[in-house]
């Protein structure tokens, strides 16, 4: 930043380590849209003098009107007042009053977060910072990561206190589009079968009103309620960030900022940094932030809070990269959602019924063995006995293999998100075609069984009309007949459920 004496009083700009740090705990009670209350813990850090025992006097620094302030907005999942400690200490040591708070979650989970109330909660934190006598109300900023960037859009629109913002790996597009992008891209990175990516698109086409996921189509962009990205903005991405659409995200931020008359947008890319700019696997303790990031973000915050003119390039650092486009074509389909849920519900009920019948047959068989009786349990005809058993086992293995492939994809993606190196598992690729082959074998086999049953039934009808003795078509025991039709129906609905997920389309 250019040194401007009229704004700095001829004093040198503070940097990381210019001040020692004092901290204290504060509590704020926030309320959700449903009226649920949560007591947030907050760590407030303030610049201290050289002794480290008393707060520094802003009048003796470039911050003659009061220290600038910063609060932090959490990303997805849970968050605590102990988070962001390293960045908060960096900023405080450069003269900022910082507040790190518990994430406002109330009684919600990731899929039903109360975004409007979360924004109000963070606004309440901003108001608290503004109420401090040693804080300059015109120099308060926000630091948002990942999901927090969605909430920051609401905060920026509704709060008059925010004068600049730092967005770390920001989510820009709607949750449906963001999920579609990062899951599809990550499946490609872990070399999963492309069929799983096509399945993701079908799952994300579920109607949110039916599955009670209102946030998936939450419209964070709402110019009718106020402009967005109208304040100085610092955007940072890591080259190993596998969750955000970096090129599309930056383009959208620039588009909205320029539309609202803001040309003060700085973009930085950092090599090796993951989704939250940590180095390595963030699941491990004490992972560091990307090289130079802490200096860059601190220097930018100091210069911007003082209103200085930036002399470095607006866009710099590692090249930002994006392998696929944003899936803006994905939207909710009510009919498909209802059909899939109905089929899934019936399939689960049939699986439970089939399991009960299998357990019952085992108990009956054990009873026969104890009593020395050799009579059959099901009484199925010889033709059906082997086929129904083989197809039942094949159907269950097909479903289990399919679900195992999905589970392995999820595990690999989670590790990738945390910053670990990609894990290539053969299961994520061959489970898809093998499931297809097994499913087709079941369909062909059962088709031959039912065609044979139709022939037999037709022949038996003729025998009945001639009043000739009639042999059993399916089984000579009611338990066997029930078992056959429940097993057949279970296999049918398993295949139908897999078909609705797109198993036979790719």
Provide a role label for each language-model segment.
Residues 294-334:
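Juxtamembrane amphipathic/hinge helix adjacent to a transmembrane helix
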Residues 321-506:
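Extended non-globular C-terminal regions
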Residues 2-311:
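Soluble extramembrane regions of membrane proteins in the secretory/endomembrane system
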């Amino acid at each position: 930043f250019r040194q401007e004496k009229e704004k700095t009083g001829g004093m040198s700009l503070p940097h990381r380590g210019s001040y020692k740090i004092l901290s204290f705990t504060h509590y704020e009670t926030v309320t959700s849209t449903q009226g649920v209350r949560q007591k947030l813990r907050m760590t407030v850090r303030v610049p201290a003098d050289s002794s480290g025992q008393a707060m520094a006097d802003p009048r003796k620094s470039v911050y003659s009107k009061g220290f600038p302030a910063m609060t932090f907005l959490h990303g997805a999942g849970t968050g605590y007042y102990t988070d962001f400690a390293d960045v908060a200490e960096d900023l405080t040591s450069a003269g900022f009053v910082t507040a790190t708070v518990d994430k406002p979650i109330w009684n919600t989970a990731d899929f039903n977060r109360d975004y409007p109330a979360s924004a109000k909660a963070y606004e309440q934190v901003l108001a608290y910072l503004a109420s401090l006598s040693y804080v300059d109300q015109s120099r308060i900023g926000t630091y948002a990561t990942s999901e927090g960037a969605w909430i920051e859009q609401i905060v920026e629109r509704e709060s008059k206190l925010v004068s600049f913002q730092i967005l770390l790996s920001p989510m820009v597009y709607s949750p449906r589009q963001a999920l579609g992008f990062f899951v599809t891209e990550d499946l490609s990175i872990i070399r999963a079968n492309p069929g799983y990516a096509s399945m993701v698109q079908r799952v994300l086409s579920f109607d949110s009103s039916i599955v009670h996921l209102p946030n998936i189509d939450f419209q964070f962009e709402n110019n009718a309620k106020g402009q967005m990205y109208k304040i100085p903005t610092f955007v940072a991405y890591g080259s190993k960030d596998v969750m955000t659409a970096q090129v599309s995200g930056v383009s959208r931020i620039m588009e909205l900022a320029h539309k609202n008359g803001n040309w003060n947008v700085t973009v930085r890319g950092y090599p090796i940094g993951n989704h939250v700019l940590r180095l390595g696997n963030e699941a491990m303790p004490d992972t560091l932030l990307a090289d130079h990031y802490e200096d860059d973000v601190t220097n930018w915050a100091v210069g911007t809070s003082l209103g200085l003119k930036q002399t470095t390039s607006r866009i710099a650092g590692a090249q930002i990269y994006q392998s696929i486009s944003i899936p803006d074509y994905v939207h909710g389909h009510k009919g498909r959602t209802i059909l899939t849920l109905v089929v899934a519900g019936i399939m689960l009920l049939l699986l439970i019924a089939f399991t009960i019948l299998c357990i019952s047959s085992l108990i009956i068989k054990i009873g026969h063995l104890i009593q020395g009786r050799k009579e059959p349990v099901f009484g199925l005809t010889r033709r059906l006995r082997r086929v129904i058993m083989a197809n039942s086992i094949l159907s269950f293995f097909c479903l289990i293999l399919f679900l195992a492939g999905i589970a392995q994809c999820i595990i690999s993606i989670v590790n990738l998100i945390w910053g670990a190196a990609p894990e290539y598992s053969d299961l994520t690729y061959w489970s898809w075609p093998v499931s297809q082959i097994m499913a087709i074998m079941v369909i062909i086999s059962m088709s031959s069984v039912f065609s044979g049953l139709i022939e037999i039934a037709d022949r038996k009808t003729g025998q009945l009309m001639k009043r000739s003795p009639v042999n059993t078509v399916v089984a000579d025991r009611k338990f066997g007949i029930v078992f056959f039709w429940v097993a057949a129906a279970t296999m049918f609905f398993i295949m139908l459920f897999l078909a609705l997920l797109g198993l036979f389309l790719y």
